[in-house]
Amino acid sequence: MIISMWALYAIIAAVLWGVDYALTERALQTIRFPMLLSIELFFGFLTMLGIAIFSGSYKTDLAGLFSSNRAIALVVAIVVAFNIANMFIVLSIGDKNATLSGLIEISYPLFIALFSWLFFKENNLSAGAILGGIFVLTGVSLIYFSNK
């Protein structure tokens, strides 16, 4: 069986998020979250800017972005949500630990489904996905209440 690229990308992302969260827990013993996030985001900016310039996509993307008020609004909302979410997960890791914070955060796909429906009227849920979501919520509740 050959794995689809989208699934491989998601697995790689999950592994790297695991590395990031474990390292974040240790880094927060030395530095505070604003500095850690500033460093992460600064180098992320440089990396992505380099990729955009090298691939040549920046010209097309900037033209597309600034030709649409909707695109600008979406990007602003994404930047706000991304930065606030990063701040809260790092605060959670610092307050408890990377393992429990990550296990609670794993519920975010439920919110993807909710907001995709609320914002765009998209419904990508199957019976299996709904059942899986119920298991996720049950697991999150079990983790939270057994680790207060």
Language-model region placement:
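Membrane-interface interhelical linkers
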Residues: 1-12, 29-34, 42-76, 83-95, ...
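N-terminal signal-anchor/start-transfer transmembrane helix
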Residues: 12-27
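Structural signature of transmembrane alpha-helices in multi-pass secondary transporters
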Residues: 13, 78, 105-108
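Hydrophobic/small/kink-forming positions within alpha-helical transmembrane segments
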Residues: 18, 22, 49, 79-84, ...
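Small-residue-mediated transmembrane helix hinge/kink sites in multi-pass secondary transporters
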Residues: 25, 90, 116-117
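Juxtamembrane helix-start motifs in multi-pass secondary transporters
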Residues: 36-37, 101
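C-terminal transmembrane-helix exit sites in multi-pass transporters
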Residues: 110-130
